[in-house]
Curated annotation (Swiss-Prot):
The lineage of its organism: Eukaryota, Metazoa, Chordata, Craniata, Vertebrata. It is found in: Secreted; Nucleus, Nucleolus; Cytoplasm; Mitochondrion. Induction: By spinal cord injury. This effect is particularly prominent in macrophages, microglia and reactive astrocytes. Keywords: Autocatalytic cleavage, Cleavage on pair of basic residues, Cytoplasm, Disulfide bond, Endoplasmic reticulum, Glycoprotein, Hydrolase, Microsome, Mitochondrion, Nucleus, Protease, Secreted, Serine protease, Signal, Zymogen. This is Kallikrein-6.
Length: 244
């Protein structure tokens, strides 16, 4: 199988102007990702996102752009699919403590113009609320750049595992906060990359992380991807959604 590189991260202020991608993955099953969102700006894929409520999509704060369009129910970006829905964003809420330079608190909520019509191919993903959850087997997905430098038509998936905080801090000395976690694959270098930012890290059928930043080039066996640690934000997410 053709190996794909998943670069789900942008590094430093300049990174936030790029997009992320998947490395060493393969095509996802069409029914395996009903929560996945594709964020577009000016007709081009910008980032991934996650449907967590019929009216709300969660993504990375560095994906903030004007006039975002959100697509749900997508599998092949080059085709118009009967399952797809498109919505504009009426409200973007970046975490108040987001720091673009360090990528700390890299999380944002997007309120859709209208509720998503839930179906087999459009469903919200539950949040991981337990930061001590020990499910280490995870997967990442997105339409980001692959190992051969192309952007795939169909969404790609890769299985990875959580990396201990000690290993994470060793890979990125002085850069990892409690609001971040690392995941990767030391055997094949499976990773997120350009075009995958803001997309989900799914562990045990719950949203554990959001693609945030990492090593450039993507897919290093020694440098795992860095993700926003979603369990740290469940209260903020709930309060934001419930706010008038």
């Amino acid at each position: 199988m053709k190996k794909l590189m998943v670069v789900l991260s942008l590094i430093a202020a300049a990174w936030a102007e790029e997009q992320n991608k998947l490395v060493h993955g393969g095509p996802c099953d069409k029914t395996s990702h009903p929560y996945q969102a594709a964020l577009y700006t000016s007709g081009h894929l910008l980032c991934g996102g996650v449907l967590i409520h019929p009216l709300w999509v969660l993504t990375a704060a560095h994906c903030k752009k004007p006039n975002l369009q959100v697509f749900l129910g997508k599998h092949n970006l080059r085709q118009r699919e009967s399952s797809q829905e498109q919505s504009s964003v009426v409200r973007a809420v970046i975490h108040p403590d987001y720091d673009a330079a360090s990528h700390d608190q890299d999380i944002m909520l997007l309120r859709l113009a209208r509720p998503a019509k839930l179906s087999e191919l459009i469903q919200p993903l539950p949040l991981e609320r337990d930061c001590s959850a020990n499910t280490t087997s995870c997967h990442i997905l997105g339409w980001g750049k692959t190992a051969d430098g192309d952007f795939p038509d169909t969404i790609q998936c890769a299985y990875i595992h959580l990396v201990s905080r000690e290993e994470c801090e060793h890979a990125y000395p002085g850069q990892i906060t409690q609001n971040m976690l690392c995941a990767g694959d030391e055997k094949y270098g499976k990773d997120s990359c350009q075009g995958d930012s803001g997309g989900p890290l799914v562990c045990g059928d719950h949203l554990r992380g959001l693609v945030s930043w990492g090593n450039i080039p993507c897919g290093s066996k020694e440098k795992p991807g860095v993700y926003t640690n979603v369990c740290r934000y469940t209260n903020w997410i709930q309060k934001t959604i419930q706010a008038k």
